């Protein structure tokens, strides 16, 4: 089986905005991500934001609706096309580019904030992505991220449970060996001049609560309620970074 199979994003790009589809789960995750990021940027109005790995534009549109000046980039051309079309439909002014995150086509010190969510574990050279994020950030700009820890628990939950057993995530979408330990990410960020690092757990399982894991096993991450509407599990932002984690750093 091919690992880290990024063709999935091109083949399924039309599902970014379809409720109940795997890619649309990002909309659920973004509620918690952006709430966390907003604790460092109370108002997004006029803030110049780069959304690395924007996909179909879910986070980009959320911030654009809060009057941020948003630019999105992604390696999936079909996802960029979907993002552009959806922004036009909703009369949102967002600039989208089909480019590599390791080689951003932007001037230095252009952005107030850079988002990099569900990206670092997929790219060819995540250290280079960190370097590029630092380059395009203004002094005192904020780097926001989330990614997956390389741990036994992440293999158990993200690979064995969600990919291999319940197939909530398409098998082969991730490569466990490309997951990143928090200390590795912190070391690289600090070496690139991104300091004041804060890391929190982005916890899908309530600290590996067995009742939650059982529910995921039988219902997946996106179960339906009595009205047959998707009702994803609540996410906790806590101190458990053993599977998935998010955070921020500041360019000095």
Regions found by a protein language model. Name each.
Residues 147, 167-184:
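Acceptor-substrate binding/catalytic loop of class I
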Residues 1-18:
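N-terminal, positively charged/glycine-rich alpha-helical extensions of SAM-dependent methyltransferases
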Residues 58-103:
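Class I SAM-dependent methyltransferase SAM/SAH-binding core
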């Amino acid at each position: 089986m091919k690992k880290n199979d990024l063709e999935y994003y091109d083949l399924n790009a039309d599902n970014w905005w379809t409720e109940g589809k795997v890619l649309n789960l990002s909309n659920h995750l973004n509620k918690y991500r952006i709430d966390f990021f907003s604790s460092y940027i109370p108002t997004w109005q006029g803030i110049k934001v780069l959304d690395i790995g924007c996909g179909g534009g879910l986070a980009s549109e959320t911030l654009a609706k809060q009057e941020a000046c948003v630019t999105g980039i992604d390696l999936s051309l079909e996802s960029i096309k979907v993002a552009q079309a959806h922004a036009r439909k909703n009369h949102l002014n967002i600039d989208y580019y089909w480019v590599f995150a390791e080689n951003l086509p932007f001037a230095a010190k252009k952005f107030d904030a850079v988002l990099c969510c569900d990206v670092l574990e997929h790219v060819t050279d995540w250290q280079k992505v960190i370097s590029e994020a630092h380059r395009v950030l203004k002094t005192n700009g904020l780097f926001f991220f989330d990614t997956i820890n390389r741990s036994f628990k992440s293999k158990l939950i993200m690979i064995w449970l969600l990919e291999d057993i319940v197939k909530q995530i398409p098998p082969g979408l991730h490569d466990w060996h490309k997951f990143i330990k928090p200390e590795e990410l912190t070391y690289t960020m600090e070496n690139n001049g991104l300091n004041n690092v804060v890391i929190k757990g982005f916890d899908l399982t309530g600290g590996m609560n067995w009742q939650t894991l059982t529910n995921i096993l039988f219902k997946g991450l996106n179960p339906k309620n009595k009205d047959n509407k998707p009702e994803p599990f609540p996410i906790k932002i806590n101190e458990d970074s053993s599977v998935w984690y998010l955070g921020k750093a500041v360019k000095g």
